[in-house]
């Protein structure tokens, strides 16, 4: 009969061999975030893309007006963009009325079975393409609690006109000093912007969109439109685009401001949703990533690292727990640490 200890050590070693390459990939690429920022959004252009600016909102009556006012204050020609608010299952307040009062075109959606931003975007984009055929060249997506810098659309226009298919802006935090939770979020986004987004821009690689403050050419949707299945629709959309050979540019010059959770319970709920979404992405998107690698799209290798990051973290955690238990509960110390 095989020695059980040997089998456990072998499994732990295999777990480490599988997980460490993913960790090493992220560490090596992150180092490029320390380098000076390379490249720009592209040359200024007189041509103006026509943007459909979409805001998915649920019970956001209190904050939606501030975002819409910041969008109306853009230095972009007013006739080259239109604001759309998707009042998604808003049963507790008048989000739709507040949005109309601030000049937005409002679509009200009521579907308690398909709840989530991905479903709302799929529904809204289908409606907009039907109601405004061939009117818009690009789409820009915001959350209701955001604010946009005055030149946000101008910077996105430059990026999309100079080779990018999708563009992600630079996220700043509105309320970094409000609570310790919002302060931790501010640090999280600051590190992510530098060591993930900036690093990939310096390496000439595509980044990923992060839920809000991003834009894309209408043509990337194709005839099927927006279609995502996970609760992290931004990650799934990014994987779809990169594995198809398209470019997602990090436009650090396009700044937007995002309000962060104030309390730990809200943060925990959000993190759990992200965790579920990462697991879904690993399950649903692995075939897409493999197809992208076989097609020779180099960004697909980075996406492979992304979909494997969650399983790799779990493997490293289990490996650490195993070796900790072996150290603490070995034959000489079992009576001390493992009594009962």
For the regions a protein language model found, what residue spans apply to each?
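Acidic donor-binding/catalytic loop of UDP-sugar-dependent glycosyltransferases
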Residues: 93-94, 142-159
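N-terminal membrane-anchoring/stem segments of glycan-assembly enzymes
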Residues: 1-47
């Amino acid at each position: 009969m095989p020695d059980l200890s040997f089998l456990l050590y072998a499994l732990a070693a295999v777990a480490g061999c599988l997980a460490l390459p993913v960790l090493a990939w992220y560490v090596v690429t992150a180092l490029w975030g320390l380098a000076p920022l390379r490249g720009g959004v592209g040359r200024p252009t007189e041509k103006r893309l026509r943007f459909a600016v979409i805001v998915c909102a649920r019970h956001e009556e209190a904050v939606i007006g501030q975002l819409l006012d910041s969008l109306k204050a853009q230095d972009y020609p007013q006739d080259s963009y239109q604001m759309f608010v998707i009042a998604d299952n808003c049963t507790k307040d008048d989000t739709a009325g507040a949005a109309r009062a601030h000049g937005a075109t409002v679509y009200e959606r009521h579907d308690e079975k398909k709840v989530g931003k991905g479903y709302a975007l799929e529904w809204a984009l289908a409606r907009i393409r039907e109601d405004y055929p061939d009117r818009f060249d690009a789409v820009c997506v915001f959350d209701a609690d955001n604010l946009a810098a005055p030149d946000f659309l101008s910077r996105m226009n430059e990026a999309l006109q100079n080779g990018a298919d999708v563009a992600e802006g630079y996220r700043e935090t509105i309320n970094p000093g409000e609570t310790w939770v919002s302060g931790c979020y501010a640090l999280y986004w600051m590190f992510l912007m530098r060591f993930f987004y900036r690093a990939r821009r310096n390496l000439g690689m595509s980044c990923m969109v992060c839920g809000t403050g991003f834009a894309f050419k209408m043509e990337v949707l194709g005839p099927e439109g927006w279609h995502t299945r996970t609760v992290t629709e931004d990650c799934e959309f990014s994987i779809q685009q990169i594995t198809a050979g398209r470019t997602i540019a990090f436009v650090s010059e396009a700044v937007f401001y995002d309000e962060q959770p104030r309390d730990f319970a809200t943060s925990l709920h959000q993190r759990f949703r992200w965790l579920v979404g990462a697991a879904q992405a690993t399950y649903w998107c692995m075939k897409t990533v493999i197809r992208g690698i076989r097609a020779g799209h180099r960004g697909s290798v980075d996406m492979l690292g992304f979909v494997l990051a969650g399983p790799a973290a779990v493997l490293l955690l289990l490996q650490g727990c195993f070796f900790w238990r072996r150290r603490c509960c070995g034959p000489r110390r079992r009576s001390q640490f493992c009594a009962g």
